[in-house]
């Protein structure tokens, strides 16, 4: 008998509840004034559309990951080993990359011994620096809040949260923490983002940079992008942003490769379960704990929108917290 996935059961129960609300008939209340205001069904229909959009986004995301894993599998394995699982591919790549670096280093040393000056890198360290500059330089991405700025923000935020004791190092690996950080980034005003970029350009990359920017006087209310769960840009929205997908994938891979021992198939689920609270309410509380910490710093207007007559948004966040990828995706 297979292992019961509690998260999937909770998520399924949420879907059943949503479907029951959608299929509820109006005969239960025959008041014509109530039937004249179809606000509740309209919001339920919008909620259903948003869930469908997010699932489509996740399906595309998984298809992209599957293609990347297939290419990596073909690179690190021979044709006879193309059925290797994803964690086997990642661990094979962990040893394959140093082998390639060693080969490149030997070739570069051979080139240097013959005094071959071709204008290109002459050492492994120079190659690494050139490669890093290709993907982290200011000219590689637009300076409008895309990947390099978000990665700097993510690192500083994580350092500030762990240094302040808001989260533990173990909790730093949770997807809900990434969701909260993405929400904070989406809610930063353009003025605060510009202040952070200026500090990063001056190579002040410590956690104090973020804390100081958060303590600046609050900007006008209209300049703050309150995304909440209605936004299509934040992680708690129903469509993942490119920078969120980029960093979550990179963080998952880095965490996986950081393990000193290869997990067995039977223990992989238990390893992942130990890093994820099974109770969606605990995930939601952790999310709000991070948000409230930065609200205390006046970092952003990070209130989650709530409809007084139809408080669906909080349930949607908790539904988000129950979503997990299958074990085979890891």
UniProtKB/Swiss-Prot annotation:
Q: In which tissues is it expressed?
A: Expressed specifically in testis and fetal ovaries.
Its BP terms in the Gene Ontology are: activation of meiosis; cellular response to retinoic acid; DNA replication; meiotic cell cycle; oogenesis; regulation of transcription by RNA polymerase II; spermatogenesis
Q: Does the keyword Cytoplasm apply?
A: yes
Q: Which residues form a coiled coil?
A: 88-112
Q: Name one GO cellular component term.
A: cytoplasm
Where's it found, cell-wise? Cytoplasm; Nucleus
- A Pfam family of the record is bHLH_STRA8
- Extract the signal peptide range: none
Tell me how the protein is altered or processed after translation. Phosphorylated.
Question: Oligomeric state and partners?
Answer: Interacts with XPO1. Interacts with MEIOSIN.
State the name under which the record lists this protein.
Stimulated by retinoic acid gene 8 protein homolog
Motif Nuclear localization signal (NLS) covers: 50-55
GO MF annotation, one: protein dimerization activity
Tagged with keyword Coiled coil: yes
Major location (coarse): cytoplasm
This chain's source organism reads Homo sapiens (Human)
Report the function annotation for this chain. Answer: Meiosis-inducer required for the transition into meiosis for both female and male germ cells. In female germ cells, acts downstream of ZGLP1 as a key effector of the meiotic program: required for premeiotic DNA replication and subsequent events in meiotic prophase. During spermatogenesis, next to its role in meiotic initiation, promotes (but is not required for) spermatogonial differentiation. In complex with MEIOSIN, directly activates the transcription of a subset of critical meiotic genes playing a central role in cell-cycle switching from mitosis to meiosis.
Q: Which gene encodes it?
A: STRA8
* Keyword list, A-Z: Coiled coil, Cytoplasm, Differentiation, DNA replication, Meiosis, Nucleus, Oogenesis, Phosphoprotein, Spermatogenesis, Transcription, Transcription regulation
* PANTHER family in the cross-refs: STIMULATED BY RETINOIC ACID GENE 8 PROTEIN HOMOLOG
Q: Which InterPro entries match?
A: bHLH_STRA8, HLH_DNA-bd_sf, Stra8
């Amino acid at each position: 008998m297979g292992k019961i996935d509690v998260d999937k059961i909770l998520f399924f129960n949420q879907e059943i509840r949503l479907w029951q609300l959608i299929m509820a008939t109006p005969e239960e209340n025959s008041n014509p004034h109530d039937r004249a205001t179809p606000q509740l069904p309209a919001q339920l229909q919008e909620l259903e559309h948003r869930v469908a959009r997010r699932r489509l986004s996740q399906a595309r995301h998984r298809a992209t990951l599957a293609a990347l894993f297939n290419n990596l599998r073909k690179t690190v394995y021979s044709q006879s080993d193309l059925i290797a699982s994803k964690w086997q591919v990642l661990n094979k790549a962990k040893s394959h990359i140093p082998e390639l670096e060693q080969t490149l280093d030997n070739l570069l040393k051979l080139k240097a011994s013959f005094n071959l000056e071709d204008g290109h890198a002459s050492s492994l360290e120079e190659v690494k620096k050139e490669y890093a500059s290709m993907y982290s330089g200011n000219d590689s991405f637009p300076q409008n809040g895309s990947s390099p700025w978000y990665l700097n923000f993510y690192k500083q935020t994580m350092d500030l949260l762990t240094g302040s004791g808001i989260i533990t190092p173990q909790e730093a690996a949770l997807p809900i923490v990434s969701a909260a950080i993405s929400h904070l980034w989406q809610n930063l005003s353009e003025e605060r983002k510009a202040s952070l970029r200026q500090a990063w350009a001056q190579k002040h990359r410590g956690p104090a940079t973020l804390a100081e920017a958060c303590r600046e006087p609050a900007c006008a209310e209209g300049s703050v992008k309150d995304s909440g769960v209605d936004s299509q840009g934040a992680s708690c929205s129903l469509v993942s942003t490119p920078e969120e997908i980029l960093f979550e994938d990179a963080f998952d891979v880095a965490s996986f490769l950081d393990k000193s021992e290869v997990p067995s198939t039977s223990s992989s689920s238990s390893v992942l379960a130990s890093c994820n609270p099974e109770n969606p309410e605990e995930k939601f509380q952790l999310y709000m704990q991070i948000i409230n910490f930065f609200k205390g710093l006046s970092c952003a207007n990070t209130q989650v929108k709530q409809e007084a007559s139809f408080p669906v948004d909080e349930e949607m966040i908790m539904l988000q917290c129950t979503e997990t990828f299958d074990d085979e995706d890891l």
